[in-house]
Design a protein with these regions (language model features):
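Mature catalytic core of soluble alpha/beta enzymes
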Residues: 1-158
Length: 158
């Protein structure tokens, strides 16, 4: 009675993998799971090459002076987005993300959004979170250690 279960960390990505597996096992091949910033995709919708995904808060360079929201198509894969756009606390004018930097014990203050795409939600979920904490070189090295994963990170443009 009164129990609260938080699905932070890598739970949402891992659960997504299992949901899609179970749906496919029951004959539902074209499916998509989303919980927070975590998405896992089954087969593409009928007549489509994949599920169209736009990450409105992650703007990537599209030219020398232009930027546009990250958009991609996904099927039989996973994607996770992490950032402080919706979950944060402001204390004395400083915005702290819900993601805690283990080096300081405080919420991350560098306003970024990261998106990782890969084969499984259990991989993309924690790597997207790491994109908010690690410097670019360390994050790219972490991505390289997980086959099939790639990511984008950018400052929040709000």
């Amino acid at each position: 009675r009164g129990m609260w279960l938080g699905l932070g960390g890598l739970a949402k990505g891992m659960i997504g993998d299992e949901v899609i597996r179970l749906l496919k096992q029951r004959g539902i091949k074209s499916c998509r799971y989303r919980a927070g910033g975590d998405m896992v995709f089954g087969d593409a919708p009928p007549g489509q090459v994949g599920w169209r995904v736009t990450v409105p808060d992650l703007w990537i360079a599209a030219g020398e002076r232009e930027a546009k929201p990250l958009t991609f198509t996904a099927a039989n894969s996973a994607a996770s987005v992490s950032g402080d756009v919706y979950r944060f606390v402001e204390i004395d004018g400083v915005r702290y993300a819900h993601v805690v930097d283990p080096r300081s014990g405080l919420g991350v203050t560098d306003r970024r959004v990261s998106c990782v795409r890969g084969e499984r939600g259990i991989d993309t979920d924690p790597l997207a979170t790491a994109g908010l904490i690690l410097d670019e070189t360390s994050w790219q090295a972490a991505l390289a250690r997980v086959p099939g994963c790639r990511g984008d990170v950018a400052p929040v443009r709000r």
